[in-house]
């Protein structure tokens, strides 16, 4: 099992210097989050410039021993997925992000379900699932074409949605693999989302098993809010989570979707806190 973290935790130092520091602290992989906001100058770059910049990032971080393991899909809130036109526009951005993941060398693409009826419980849950199935099937074609191995459907912190809990995501992923005659779809467990919705992240891991657990977003909270705290600051049972990963033989990346707070200035104290976070990660994946 590998140890990863969001790239924003170390990009503040510069691409090469940040990757070097991440590696020195004990991390091996990045979770790339710069595709989330599609309104940035970066995301709006023409395709060739977009590809060149991401290829440059990949080469620089790889030179320091860091692999971009996974990339997060575009995400906007409040959601704007209500009309076919909204979803067509979103699909264009998603396809570009999948290509971006490919340019980075990332094999895992992590996506939230579309919310065509908002983040509350829809009147027609089956229609929501069908809309997502049609959308995801189209996105899978781009992933296959560009060598991105898995689209990971992430559990969410919106209890009313029919694609929120781990079990719901699992059933959807099984449906998508059947409909696409593939095994491209897996589930990303977000530990904070699970905890905020009353699910045990460890039990979610056991439910999916090695076959369906593709990626992880690891962080903590108080069981009610999606606060992205560091592990140990909230109520998640990390020993049970660690044991669950070992039980199923997970071989992917245990990736933190959290980082040392921005309030901690650069220097000795921040280095100490970042190393501590890596040590927590090593304990979870049972390296120490």
Where are these regions (language model features)?
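Structural motif corresponding to the early beta-alpha repeats
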Residues: 28-134, 260-261
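Histidine-acidic metal/acid-base catalytic patches
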Residues: 1-4, 12-28, 62, 91, ...
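Active-site-proximal loop/turn and secondary-structure-junction residues that shape catalytic pockets
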Residues: 9-11, 34-36, 74-77, 113-117, ...
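Hydrophobic, aromatic-enriched interface-forming segments
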Residues: 148-164
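Secondary-structure boundary elements
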Residues: 103, 141-150, 178-179
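A generic structural signal for short
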Residues: 6-7, 44-46, 85-86, 127-128, ...
């Amino acid at each position: 099992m590998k140890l990863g973290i969001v790239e924003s935790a170390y990009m503040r130092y510069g691409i090469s210097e940040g990757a070097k520091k991440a590696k020195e602290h004990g991390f091996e992989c990045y979770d790339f989050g710069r595709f989330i906001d599609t309104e940035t100058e970066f995301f709006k770059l023409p395709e060739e410039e977009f590809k060149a910049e991401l290829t440059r990032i990949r080469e620089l971080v790889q030179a320091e021993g860091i692999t971009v393991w996974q990339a997060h899909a575009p995400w906007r809130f409040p959601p704007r997925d209500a009309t076919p036109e909204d979803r067509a526009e979103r699909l264009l951005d998603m396809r570009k992000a999948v290509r971006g993941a490919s340019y980075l060398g990332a094999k895992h693409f992590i996506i939230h379900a579309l919310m065509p009826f908002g983040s509350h419980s829809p009147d027609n849950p089956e229609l929501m699932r069908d809309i997502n199935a049609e959308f995801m099937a189209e996105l899978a074609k781009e992933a296959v074409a560009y060598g991105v191995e898995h689209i990971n459907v992430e559990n969410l912190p919106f209890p009313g949605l029919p694609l929120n809990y781990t079990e719901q995501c699992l059933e959807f992923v099984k449906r998508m693999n059947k409909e696409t005659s593939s095994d491209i779809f897996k589930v990303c467990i977000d530990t904070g989302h699970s905890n905020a919705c009353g699910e045990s992240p460890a039990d979610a891991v056991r439910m999916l098993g090695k076959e369906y657990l593709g990626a992880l977003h690891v962080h903590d909270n108080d069981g009610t809010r999606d606060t992205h705290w560091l592990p140990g600051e909230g109520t998640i049972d990390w020993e049970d989570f660690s044991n669950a990963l070992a039980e199923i033989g997970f071989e992917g990346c245990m990736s933190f979707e959290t980082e040392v707070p921005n309030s901690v200035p650069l220097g000795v104290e921040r280095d100490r806190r970042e190393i501590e976070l890596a040590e927590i990660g090593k304990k979870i994946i049972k390296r120490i």
